[in-house]
Amino acid sequence: MPAEALLLANLFQPLINVANAVLLFFHDTIGLSWGLSIIGLTFLTRALILPLSIKQIRSMRALSALQPQIKEIQEKYKDDRERQQREMMQIYQDNNVNPFASCLPLLFQMPVFLSLLYLLRSDTFQQELHSGGDPGFLFIPDLAEKVTGWVLIVMLVLYAGTSVIAGLIMTGASASKQQRMIQLGLPLLFTPFIISFPSGVLVYWITTNVWTMGQQAVIKVFFPPDPPPTPEEIKATKPPPPPPKKKNRNR
């Protein structure tokens, strides 16, 4: 293992130990297969960060409601990017919106993702995985190894499809063309890295995408978003223009 990778593995060792303990609990205590144990780890992770996911959804809804004002500022100050950014940040501040809150669930999942990656590549866990005689899951022959051939194609289709659908559901119908292009392009961007990962990591990521899709469906039914503001409501939220300066007349 390269020195940089070894340093990162040592940094995440406490989380790797936790992930290992969770997988062993699901497999040895409950009696699930290793594939279902990884799915259980995914569900547990997503349940723990559910408050962050709710905050993410609220932030994205608030950003969506502010889009008319944002577009107006972008058009008004299209030749002055510094003023444009300043005015946009002022709108976020006035409405208590953090434009970066939508990234929190992904940021908190990355340590778990990396911990699972290092765990599946470790010799100790691979011995544990193969000792029970069930290293595979469904059509996947070995969760600790990267897949090839038609299995790889199926996994990539599942990964890309669930990533795109989950991303588009998260951004909603009000997403800009640029946001939609990003959601479509991200799976392609990560594909060269994904194909070299153990297949268990792909199981984790596909499962978290499915969780996102289900989570959004539940929230949409039980907590529907507020209707978009009318032009009159948008106009009412804008501060009144400053009064014109009185001209000094020389008597």
What is each residue range found by the language model?
Residues M1-R251:
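Helix-loop-helix
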